[in-house]
Amino acid sequence: MNEFKRFEDRLTGLIESLSPSGRRRLSAELAKRLRQSQQRRVMAQKAPDGTPYAPRQQQSVRKKTGRVKRKMFAKLITSRFLHIRASPEQASMEFYGGKSPKIASVHQFGLSEENRKDGKKIDYPARPLLGFTGEDVQMIEEIILAHLER
């Protein structure tokens, strides 16, 4: 979160002068716009640093079952699983519901997991789902300044 240190220095006093309901509205707007940005980036199959995701492992030709043709994480980044929360103190985004937090953390950090069919250990490459891009930081600054001008 070091990239937000400059926000703290410049805007802390101004943000604290807002009423609690104003801060909650600001954090709700920030969370909503950040979720949209994350969803667009994940649908483009890109990490926050702009590199493309590692492709899925190839399945053998004989095993046509189990093939997945849609883009990775298409369902995981919907608002059903990617929840936002806003309060006067903070805005947060988290994966919620069923297996989605575990799936997201395995791919975010490139962990290994046991296959549920045959018990083999599978090493997943890191595919960061959440993170800040340069455009996200700029968007946050613009939203805060626009909200303070109202």
UniProtKB/Swiss-Prot annotation:
Disordered, as annotated region: 32-66
Signal sequence segment: none
InterPro entries found in the cross-reference section: Phage_virion_morphogenesis
Source domain of life: Viruses
Pfam families associated with the record: Phage_tail_S (PF05069)
Record function comment: It is proposed that R and S are tail completion proteins that are essential for stable head joining.
Protein name: Tail completion protein S
Organism encoding this protein: Escherichia phage P2
Lineage: Viruses, Duplodnaviria, Heunggongvirae, Uroviricota, Caudoviricetes
